[in-house]
Amino acid sequence: MRLLLGLLTMTGAFAAGERRPNVLFFLTDDESWLERSAYGWSKLPTPAFDRVAEQGALFMNGFATAPSCGPARASVLTGRHFWQNEQGGFIQGFIPKEVPVVTRLLAASGYQVGRTGKGWGPGSHAKLGIPSNSLGKVFMREKLVNPPEGLNGTDYAANFDRFLAWRDAKKPFFFWAGVIEPHEPSGKENHVLLEKEFGVTLDQVSLPPFTEDTAGNRKKRARFIYEICCADTHLDRMLKSLKTAGELDNTLVVVSSDNGTAILSEGQHRGKASPYDFGVHVPLTMMWPAGMKPGRKVTDFVSFADLAPTFLEMAGLEVPDSMTGRSLLPILKSEKSGRIEAQRDFIMTGLEWHGEFDPTSRSSRSIRDDRFSYVVRYANVDAQGKSLDNEALMKPLKIEFYDLKKDPWELNNLADDPKFAAEKKRLADKMRKLGKESGDPRVTGEMDLFRKTRQYVQKRKRMGYKKSASLPFDE
């Protein structure tokens, strides 16, 4: 019924013969927002990303819903907070098949949907989950010739060209370009290629303050940065292909990354898999020549959960009630910079599992606004390794609080400083309120499904991610 209503909405949204907009969704793997020079910290030469930002809007506060690829990518598809995706809130879990996903809704309305590279996941396509073809027709045939060590080898841009040649030019399209770079491992000599191909020397490489400044760390960072630069060349080629096909003006180009940079500090996760900004704050820029004013910087806090409602509304389709994200179309249509929607003044993210075995836990929630960040970490088992009951699973294992104005890297925990008690309580109350309203099991105490899913993904990992009838969910 919802889909029918959406189709009825669609027919009234566009004049006869008017083409609905296309979408090119370009997603890298493991890249914090500051990696891009457009944000003012690095010296990374990524001209294609910069072009999209200059001809569209650069989002200063774009966030993944989780610092982990599986749950973050699931939110792009479902338009929901990661904790609302049930088994899909865990890497190596699955998105329940009854949950509407944006690519299937677009396809049902006449969009041609395709992808290259990494789609949703890694995860399971159990009988209870969405099918493996939910991102449309796969284009993976084209490969790079003699790619440098560490690069995946997929020629993403050439595969996009194949998609453009395959599609019906009279119909709109949605294409998911899942670039696997800059995910580790990286090539041992790619720091040399960074200077040779992109002109970036080791002394120009930006290092976070929690990373020791050594020659080895600079080389490691340079090898990582090289892959970002290589990814940008594919974006450049795709933009040129859109122009050649006459589709650039009518295409919303969205460029982002699924979670933050994979980086450690004294063995502790500070980026990917962490609740800090370097884990969930991602690059995000959008360009739509026919529909957006160029040259804008937007400070609204936006989430991956907002993307699916945006794509649907832009296509003239009804947004299902299941999608709790809010469409960004009013922001895209605005001519202003800065804070466009006053209520977008904070963001809440979190994580349940990123491949660890009990008793190690990376389960967390984080809420932040323009000034402060409040972090809660949770345990999942007791000291004897026994699973905690629901009430205990709601209780914080550790609380952290940061003044982002004075400490943007979140290194000085002020949770016990009485001067910040009121601000800490304000964000804690806001986290509980949003968690209760949105059904976060860590707030409501309804942790049975999450406990079972944690057992499921841990067992899948021990079994090498092979299907088995002995797993907690029917495969």
Describe the residue ranges of each PLM region.
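Short, charged, surface-exposed hinge/linker loops at domain edges
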Residues: 443-457
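Formylglycine-dependent sulfatase
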Residues: 12-399, 408-429, 436, 442-443, ...
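Extracellular, beta-strand-rich glycan-interacting domains
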Residues: 404-406
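Sec-dependent signal peptide recognition
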Residues: 1-6
